[in-house]
A protein has these predicted regions:
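A conserved regulatory-domain signal marking ACT and ACT-like small-molecule sensing domains
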Residues: 1-180
Length: 180
């Protein structure tokens, strides 16, 4: 529905302080015949933190991300688990820069003290490998090819994040060079 779309864009514009010129309803994206993947990037400056057993209710993810943003900590890959049926909680995992580790843990420790049963868990040493290409939206199966290439090297994927022109896999640090 066009009216619903316009309302959503107005709300986004207000939240992110966008001008009318910066907002487009149903933008057209044309195949520019760019390569499916133009480059691969390996980021070794990442860690993974999970906040376990957080309340499964509106605002929980916002509270976690806002708490970290107040400490100038940026998150990249964010994954939320399905609800755990017994206690109505979820787990939220994310990656951030290694040098933000102690600030993030300190900020989150105070926050999760308010949520009974919640705890912080630091994942194993990880790296972020990303395939980037403006041809991805026009090529079917790009993510599958990336996942297959990693599987062929016996590399397990811990987390996945995608955008229109990027597919990112979080993998064990020991496989970073091999994944390239």
């Amino acid at each position: 529905d066009a009216e619903l779309g316009k309302k959503a864009l107005r709300n986004v514009g207000e939240v992110f302080k966008l001008t009318d010129k910066q907002i487009t309803l149903n933008p057209t994206i044309e195949n520019n015949n760019e390569p499916e993947v133009r480059g691969i990037a390996l980021d070794k400056d990442q860690i993974q933190i999970s906040v376990k057993n957080v309340p499964d209710k509106p605002g929980t993810a916002s509270t976690i991300c806002s708490t970290l943003a107040e400490k100038n900590i940026s998150l990249d890959t964010i994954v939320q688990s399905e609800r755990k049926h017994k206690d109505k909680t979820k787990d939220i995992s994310f990656t951030l820069k290694k040098n933000d580790r102690s600030d993030a843990k300190y900020a989150l420790k105070e926050l999760i003290g308010n949520w009974q049963g919640s705890k912080l868990e630091e994942g194993e040493s990880i790296v972020r490998i990303s395939a980037v290409g403006s041809g991805m939206p026009f090529t079917k199966g790009t993510a599958g090819k990336i996942f297959r290439a990693l599987a062929n090297q016996k590399i397990n994927i811990e987390m996945i994040a995608t955008s229109e022109i990027r597919t990112t896999c979080i993998i064990s640090e020991k496989y970073g060079e091999k994944a390239l």
